[in-house]
A protein has these predicted regions:
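ABC family nucleotide-binding domain
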Residues: 1-220
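C-terminal boundary and immediately downstream tail of ABC-type ATPase nucleotide-binding domains
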Residues: 210, 221-241
């Protein structure tokens, strides 16, 4: 489903990713964690071409992401992305936020797109807010809208880049609950997060990054019970204290 082979990336002279390789199979949930500046967000953004790379190959569902021939807009319509900040259009209502890309990118009929949007708002517990504007919703609600918007495109996989890090603590669980449901329904997911409770609950594997390298790529239980590197042990000791 998702394959990264020997991926390296530089910003000028500074190397942000070094020889990163991993695979995410269909239906797998892989959590990517590590200290700030370790390259986690950059790695996940390479998967749908938001961050170009200078070396290596990236494939999603058989499409080579970093090929000049690839239609990235088409690829991104199949790979949902949820960011740290919700990236909703402030001048559009919630349901309009959910229908816009369906109509413009997937060429769906407006009525069908609206129906799909309302159905997914119901799924994330926000059907009553369909005609409100983003500023009228809490951060947790806006992030749930962002997840619903990505799901409207019928993605084959979902990428999450620290989806709860901009939220107040009491709003984190309402977003994680939606993500847990998605995982349990079999959605293929790559998730950059510090929420280790979420990782323990639904991850199949955990990738630990440091200084632009994948240091560990282990089954969840093995990572938490017996991390191989001192750097990962130190990270877990601090985050699970």
């Amino acid at each position: 489903m998702i394959s990264l082979k020997n991926v390296s990336k530089w910003y000028g002279q500074f190397q942000v990713l070094t020889d990163c390789s991993t695979e995410v199979k269909k239906g797998e949930v892989v959590v990517v964690c590590g200290p700030s500046g370790s390259g986690k967000s950059t790695l996940i953004k390479t998967v749908n071409g938001l961050e170009p790379v200078q070396q290596g190959t990236i494939e999603v569902n058989g499409t080579q992401v970093n090929s000049k021939k690839t239609d990235l807009a088409k690829l991104r319509s199949h790979v949902g992305m949820v960011f740290q900040h919700f990236e909703l259009f402030p001048h559009l209502s919630i349901v309009e936020n959910l229908t816009l890309a369906q109509v413009k990118v997937l060429k769906r009929d407006k009525t069908a797109a609206r129906e799909k949007g309302l159905k997914l708002l119901e799924r994330v517990g926000l059907a009553a807010h369909a005609n409100k504007y983003p500023a009228q919703l809490s951060g947790g609600q806006q992030q749930r809208v962002a997840i619903a918007r990505a799901l409207c495109m019928d993605p084959v996989a979902m990428l999450f880049d620290e989806p709860t890090s901009a939220l107040d603590p009491e709003m984190i669980n309402e977003v994680l609950d939606v993500m847990v449901e998605l995982a349990q329904e079999g959605m293929t997911m790559m998730v950059v997060t510090h929420e280790m409770g979420f990782a323990r609950k639904v991850a199949n594997r955990v990738i630990f990054m440091d200084e632009g390298k994948i240091v560990e790529d282990l089954p969840k239980d093995e990572f938490f019970d017996n991390p191989q590197s001192e750097r990962a042990r130190d990270f877990l000791a601090k985050i699970l204290h």
